[in-house]
Structure formats: structure tokens, C-alpha cells
Amino acid sequence: MSSNIKSNSVIENSWAQLKQLTSARIALGRSGISLPTHAQLKFQLDHAQARDAVYFQLNVSKLCADLTQSFSSMNLESIGLQSDAIDRPTYLKRPDYGKRLSQISKEILLKRITKAKFSPNTFNYDIAFVIVDGLSALAIETNALRFLKTACTNLQSEKFTIAPFCVVEQGRVAIGDEIGELLSAKLVIVLIGERPGLSSPDSMGIYLTWHPKVGLTDESRNCISNIRNGGLSDTEATMKLRYLVTQAHKREISGIALKDETSSKQSLSSLNSFLIE
């Protein structure tokens, strides 16, 4: 009798079959006039995981060590940096602080550049990768190293010169502009933890900017978002990244002037969804 009561207590939504196609919170059904208990508990869990992702602290020294070891064959080093936001509460309350390097970090970067003895008034690198914790350090810890292995291997055939990896704590997207300008890189590629969603606390985004410099705004950048298990795969993201990087160098543009013309229709058709004809 108790099993009958349990099975009849939740009224299923007619869209329930669509739940297999998305992790979004749809077709939850109802129990009386409320959500089913399992749906309410799942919401609370997802909300807690999203909050935890915001306050998750990136282990910068470990990531730098892992990057240096993984890319030793390419002779790429890693540099740990800090934004002007001294802690997480400051970072959340003052977004502008996350857009600029702290004075100490700026000096560290300048010393590295001086040591390299680059020629003045020339570009030192074709590409500068900047890895930033953003609003989800969990996303960077989960995805950044794995993705960079795929991306750098794919880009290696293009013979681009790559700057030392810069790993930034308490940073925003725009901090890549300052770093790219200091390194005198033609193109900066920022990997950053995106704002956690209720179904994706570990989503990583990528922002590309041609001729980075302090003061640029969003229309100057291209974005590839939702890179994670269950989102955009490393292979698909790398395909998009390679196209944008090669086109940016060829045409010397980025942002709204540069469109991603990789075949999204082909990628979507591989999902075998009846919603995509």
C-alpha cells in the first residue's frame, strides 16, 4: 500500500522525456501544489555547489607546477600572479580590482620580461595564455590543464610563439589585456571560470583579444563558453579556438569583427536530438 501511495504522489510533467536532452531544471513535476521532495533537495544541493564554486580557492602554485611539467617539452614556464583584489570578498564587491594586476605581480612580470631581453617596439609572442580563477576556480582546476594539453598540441603545427603561462588569482577577464600588453603579445587567450549555474558549477570560458591593451571592452573579444564535461567538449572548443586564433593572426582582428564560422550545425547534428532537424 505504501508503494502505491509513493508512486501516485508525484504528478509527472508531460515534457519529462525532454529531461534526457538537458541538465536544465525542466519538467520537475509536482506533488500537490509543491515541487516533489527530490526536486527540491536537488535544487538545494545544486545551489550549495554553485556557492561553493564561487568561494573555492585555486591552488596557483600547484597549477603552475603542473603546467610547467606538462609543457616542459615546449620549454614553457608558468608564472603565478595576483590581481588588485586582495581576497574573495574584495573581488566580489569590487570587480574593477580584478581587472588589474597588483603592483607586486606587475613587478614580477616586468622582471621576467627584462630578463628575456626582448627587442623594443616589437611583439615578443604570438600568443599569451592567461589562466584566471574568475567566479569559479573549480572550473579552472577541473578543466584548464586538460584543455591546454589538447589546445597547445593542436596549435603546435601553426608554429606560434607562446608566452609563459600566467595563472592569476582573483582575476576578471580584462586582466588579460594588461598581461598581454606587458608581455607584448599579439593575441591574449584568457581561460576563466564562468559564473556558476545551478547545473554547471565547473564551466570554463575562453576569451580572445587581438593586440591586448588596458582599456579594451567586450566588443574587442571573442568568447567560447561552457567548456566542461557535459558542456562543450575539449575537441569542439579546440576546433573553435584554432579557427579564431588563425583568423585573428591572418586578418589582425578579433571581437565583433571576427565571426566564428566553424560548422556548428555539424556539431549539433551529432547530438541526435529530435529538436534539431
Predicted regions and their residues:
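Fold-independent oxyanion-binding glycine-rich loops
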Residues: 83-84, 132-134, 168-170, 191-195, ...
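Alpha/propeptide regions of enzymes that mature by internal proteolysis
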Residues: 52-77, 143, 150-165, 234, ...
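C-terminal functional extensions of proteins
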Residues: 194-277
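A generic structural signal for short, non-catalytic loop/turn and secondary-structure boundary residues
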Residues: 71-76, 122, 201, 217
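Short, acidic Gly/Pro/Ser/Thr-rich loop/turn segments
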Residues: 86-88, 137, 197, 215
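Active-site loop/lid in soluble adenylation, ligation, and acyl-transfer enzymes
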Residues: 2-107, 267-271
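Conserved mixed alpha/beta catalytic, RNA-binding, or beta-rich assembly cores of soluble enzyme
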Residues: 99-116, 122-130, 134-188, 199, ...
